[in-house]
Amino acid sequence: WIMGHMVNAIYQIDEFVNLGANSIETDVSFDDNANPEYTYHGIPCDCGRSCLKWENYNDFLKGLRSATTPGNSKYQSKLILVVFDLKTGSLYDNQASEAGKKLAKNLLKHYWNNGNNGGRAYIVLSIPDLNHYPLIKGFTDTLKQEGHPELLEKVGYDFSGNDAIGDVAKAYKKAGVSGHVWQSDGITNCLLRGLSRVKDAVANRDSGKGYINKVYYWTVDKRATTRDALDAGVDGVMTNYPDVIADVMNEAAYKNKVRLATYEDSPWVTFRK
């Protein structure tokens, strides 16, 4: 999965997919009442990027739905996974569950079209704080209450705070999650970060006993870092330059080992060599 980083304006969906991304990451900010409000990152953000692009969250969802609904004039068949980077740092811990409920209602209405031929992309809810694990239950309970438990097949989870793997496992246990887990690791492209925790996550994924199904590394903009990440065995690379990742995947060392995921590749099933 080549994951386009910080895709917060609707026009950027096409821009990143056309550069080679089959997945995008979108920031979600919340208002004081835990309503998802804007697709907005703000300052500071990655070096070389504008931090200030935004849409109203519901408008972005409608644009995303168009891009991921077969038959729509804006349909992009390659776009199969969307990571919502939930900026819950602005919320009190006791608002996490409410944020999950509201997120579920917004997605159900504006993205899934109330279960009636909505967008088809898989969704990852990425949460920066382990203490906000109740967001997951708020989300899953709401989809069930609204009569659409089947849409949970399309939803996965990520804790993005670079916490110890064991602590992340405990948070999932509390949230009642087993499966559909992506584990992120990384840092802004302005700084360097080693691969030791990525390797721990890959080992957990491949042990058959861990909680992780897929691993992604962020933010990867250079060819050398891309090669290191692919060598470490990641499933996804988040990048500001999808074309760079696509180029590396076409190099002799990788073109027979890795390929771009398609809609038929489940993002929840661990790939066995």
Swiss-Prot record:
Keyword Magnesium included in the entry's annotation: yes
Expression sites (tissue/organ): Expressed by the venom gland.
Metal-binding as UniProt keyword: yes
Chain sites annotated for binding Mg(2+): E25, D27, D85
Localization terms from the record: Secreted
Enzyme Commission designation: 4.6.1.-
BP GO terms, sorted: killing of cells of another organism; lipid catabolic process
Keywords, ordered alphabetically: Cytolysis, Dermonecrotic toxin, Disulfide bond, Hemolysis, Lipid degradation, Lipid metabolism, Lyase, Magnesium, Metal-binding, Secreted, Toxin
Cofactor: Mg(2+)
GO CC, any one term: extracellular region
Domain of life: Eukaryota
Cofactor-binding details, from the entry: Binds 1 Mg(2+) ion per subunit.
Active site (catalytic residues): H5, H41 (nucleophile)
Function as written in the Swiss-Prot or TrEMBL entry: Dermonecrotic toxins cleave the phosphodiester linkage between the phosphate and headgroup of certain phospholipids (sphingolipid and lysolipid substrates), forming an alcohol (often choline) and a cyclic phosphate. This toxin acts on sphingomyelin (SM). It may also act on ceramide phosphoethanolamine (CPE), lysophosphatidylcholine (LPC) and lysophosphatidylethanolamine (LPE), but not on lysophosphatidylserine (LPS), and lysophosphatidylglycerol (LPG). It acts by transphosphatidylation, releasing exclusively cyclic phosphate products as second products.
Family to which the UniProt record says this protein belongs: Belongs to the arthropod phospholipase D family. Class II subfamily.
The protein's name in its UniProt record: Dermonecrotic toxin LhSicTox-alphaIA2biv
Organism field: Loxosceles hirsuta (Recluse spider)
